[in-house]
C-alpha cells in the first residue's frame, strides 16, 4: 500500500466513535442494534459505535448505564495483536495493517502506525514512535523515545527504511525517506536527515558519520537473543 492509497483509505473510511457501556436492568430479552453484548439478565457490557450503543440503551429496559468513549471519529482500527508471533507489552498501540515479524518485541508505550513493517527479532523500545509505512529490518533495536518518521503527512513517496542489525539509540530521530544501512549504529539523540552507509556509526544534529563499526562498537551494541524468547 503506497502513501496515497493509505491517505485515501483514511479519508474515505467510515469514522467510528468506539465506546463501551456498562448497563443494568431487565436484560433477559435485550434487543441489540449493531452492538456486542456480554453479560447476564441483570448486568452486562455493550461494545460498538456510540450511536448504536445509545440506540440500544434507548430501546431496552435499561435502568442504569455508564458509557466510556475509547476513540472519537476513528478512521482506522487497532490491530488484532493475537495474529502476531511476537512479545507485545501492555500499553503498546499498534494500528491495523502493520506487519510484525516472528520474535519481535514491542515495549510499553510504543506507537506503530498504519503500513509499518517490523522485522523478525527487532525490539521497539518504550515510547518509540514508528510512523506510517516505515520499514525496519531484522534484529534491530530502536531505542526508547526514538521517532522514525512516517510518510502519511506530509506525504512522501519513499518511506524510512532501516536495514537489518541496526542499533538506534534513545531519542534519535530519523526523517522521512532516509535509508539506514545494515549493521549501522545511530547514537542517542541523533537527528538523521540523509542516507547512512552500512556499518557506519553516526552522531550529532544533524547526524554525521563519525567512524565505521568496529569490534568495540559491536560489543557495546549487542542484540540479546534471550530477550526475544517467546517460551
Curated annotation (Swiss-Prot):
The keyword Amino-acid biosynthesis applies. PROSITE patterns: HEXAPEP_TRANSFERASES. Pfam families: DapH_N, Hexapep. InterPro entries: DapH, DapH_N, Hexapep, Hexapep_transf_CS, Trans_hexapeptide_repeat, Trimer_LpxA-like_sf. Its EC number is 2.3.1.89. Pathway: Amino-acid biosynthesis; L-lysine biosynthesis via DAP pathway; LL-2,6-diaminopimelate from (S)-tetrahydrodipicolinate (acetylase route): step 1/3. Coiled coil: none annotated. Gene3D superfamilies: Hexapeptide repeat proteins (2.160.10.10), Malonyl-CoA ACP transacylase, ACP-binding (3.30.70.250). GO terms for molecular function: tetrahydrodipicolinate N-acetyltransferase activity. PANTHER family: 2,3,4,5-TETRAHYDROPYRIDINE-2,6-DICARBOXYLATE N-ACETYLTRANSFERASE (PTHR43300:SF10), ACETYLTRANSFERASE (PTHR43300). Catalyzes the transfer of an acetyl group from acetyl-CoA to tetrahydrodipicolinate. NCBIfam families: DapD_Ac. This is 2,3,4,5-tetrahydropyridine-2,6-dicarboxylate N-acetyltransferase. It comes from Thermosipho melanesiensis (strain DSM 12029 / CIP 104789 / BI429). The lineage of its organism: Bacteria, Thermotogati, Thermotogota, Thermotogae, Thermotogales.
Amino acid at each position: 500500500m503506497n502513501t496515497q492509497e493509505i491517505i485515501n483509505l483514511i479519508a474515505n473510511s467510515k469514522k467510528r466513535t468506539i465506546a463501551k457501556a456498562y448497563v443494568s436492568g431487565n436484560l433477559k430479552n435485550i434487543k441489540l442494534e449493531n452492538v456486542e453484548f456480554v453479560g447476564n439478565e441483570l448486568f452486562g457490557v455493550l461494545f460498538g459505535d456510540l450511536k448504536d450503543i445509545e440506540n440500544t440503551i434507548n430501546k431496552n429496559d435499561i435502568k442504569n448505564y455508564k458509557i466510556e468513549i475509547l476513540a472519537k471519529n476513528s478512521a482506522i482500527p487497532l490491530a488484532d495483536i493475537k495474529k502476531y508471533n511476537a512479545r507485545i507489552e501492555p500499553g503498546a498501540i499498534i494500528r491495523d495493517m502493520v506487519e510484525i515479524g516472528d520474535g519481535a518485541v514491542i515495549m510499553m508505550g510504543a506507537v506503530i502506525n498504519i503500513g509499518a513493517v517490523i522485522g523478525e527479532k527487532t525490539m521497539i523500545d518504550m515510547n518509540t514512535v514508528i510512523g506510517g509505512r516505515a520499514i525496519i529490518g531484522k534484529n534491530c533495536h530502536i531505542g526508547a523515545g526514538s521517532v522514525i518518521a512516517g510518510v502519511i503527512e506530509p506525504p512522501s513517496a519513499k518511506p524510512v527504511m532501516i536495514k537489518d542489525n541496526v542499533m538506534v539509540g534513545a531519542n534519535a530521530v530519523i526523517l522521512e525517506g532516509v535509508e539506514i544501512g545494515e549493521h549501522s549504529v545511530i547514537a542517542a539523540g541523533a537527528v538523521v536527515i540523509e542516507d547512512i552507509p552500512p556499518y557506519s556509526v553516526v552522531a550529532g544534529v544533524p547526524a554525521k558519520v563519525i567512524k565505521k563499526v568496529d569490534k568495540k562498537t559491536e560489543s557495546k551494541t549487542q542484540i540479546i537473543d534471550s530477550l526475544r524468547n517467546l517460551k
